[in-house]
């Protein structure tokens, strides 16, 4: 499902508190294009849940992951994948061929995610190219993200590609690759973060992967997020093949 087209036919997807949205396969994922918004505002007693049909019929378990795609927000905030002089026309393709992102609007607004859970996502769209639970690609600081959980994603829990978006109250549990990942000039803030690796899954990887830009280490803006009040609970595996480190 795509909300709007790239900088055209802008739309806002509104999801009511207590709603459950489910995907049937890896081809099912939600993309909010540049210029459009999502308004997913749940509550502590009525969160909005994005999950798989397997979860709905009770066949998901503690090791389930990758049963549907995930959520991708595409914004118009800066990324160092584009030169500063060309930010206004920046157009970078997001992971999973989800669409273009980037621009010269650091305060860009892609909507609201509040009291939202994302479970059992991260399908491998093409070989070695999985979707994250939530992908923030060029998402601006006008976007509100508060009380977000990503559970049992087969790739990263959340990943930031450039942008300036802030996140508060972030819970990342049982994700198989990095729980919190950023690259390409993300300069947002994260506060109140809990990361817990699945103690029974050898595929659990690092809690954090932090990059600037893989092809140009000195690219600006340099990735420089601020993180406060974080707890990381790693695994206790001792085999050489297992990743037991918190970071």
PLM region spans:
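Beta-strand/loop edge motif enriched in small/polar residues
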Residues: 1-247
């Amino acid at each position: 499902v795509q909300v709007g087209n790239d900088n055209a036919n802008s739309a806002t997807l509104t999801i009511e508190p207590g709603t459950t949205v489910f995907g049937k396969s890896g081809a099912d994922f939600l993309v909010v294009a540049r210029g459009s918004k999502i308004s997913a505002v749940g509550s502590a007693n009525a969160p909005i849940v994005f999950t798989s049909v397997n979860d709905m019929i009770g066949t998901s378990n503690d090791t389930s992951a990758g049963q549907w795609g995930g959520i991708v927000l595409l914004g118009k905030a800066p990324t160092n994948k584009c030169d500063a002089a060309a930010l206004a026309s920046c157009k970078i393709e997001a992971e999973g061929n989800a669409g273009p992102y980037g621009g010269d609007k650091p305060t860009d607004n892609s909507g609201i995610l509040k009291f939202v859970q994302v479970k059992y996502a991260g399908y491998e769209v093409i070989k070695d190219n999985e979707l994250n639970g939530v992908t923030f690609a060029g998402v601006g600081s006008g976007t509100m993200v508060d009380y977000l959980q990503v559970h049992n994603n087969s790739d990263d829990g959340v990943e930031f590609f450039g942008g300036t978006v802030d996140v508060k109250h972030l819970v990342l549990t049982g994700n198989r690759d990095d729980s919190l990942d950023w690259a390409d000039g993300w300069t947002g803030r994260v506060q109140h973060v809990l990361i817990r690796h699945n103690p029974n899954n050898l595929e659990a990887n690092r809690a954090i992967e932090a990059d600037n830009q893989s092809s140009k280490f000195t690219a600006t803006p340099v990735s420089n997020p601020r993180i406060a009040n974080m707890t990381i609970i790693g695994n206790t595996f001792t085999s050489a093949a297992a990743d037991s480190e918190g970071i």
